């Protein structure tokens, strides 16, 4: 048995995200272009509970705007600040992630989880096409 306090002081919401096999969230659009989530009123604190998950992050305000972050159970929480494009990928065995989010005034779940395609966002597409991602593996 292993009991650890995994609290996030800032958290006021929690989501359990289960991929039972290989999965991409959000999935590519109908023409095969990558899609991302972008929360305007939520910071994510994603922690892998089981398996492994890789996150792709793009933030126009960062010095290095494109990151790929590989997480496992030992990684700790990946903080994804609001206004960061993000998507996640699980391998064949799937993964379970708990997101201990911080939601801000104005949060509306019907607007915060709409996939955004790089096919119709030229700025996002340009970053994915031209910038080399910074690759991180946390928890090794």
Language-model features, listed with the residues they occupy:
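Active-site region of the double-stranded beta-helix
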Residues: 4-73, 92-140
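Histidine-centered metal-chelating micro-motifs
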Residues: 75-87, 105-106
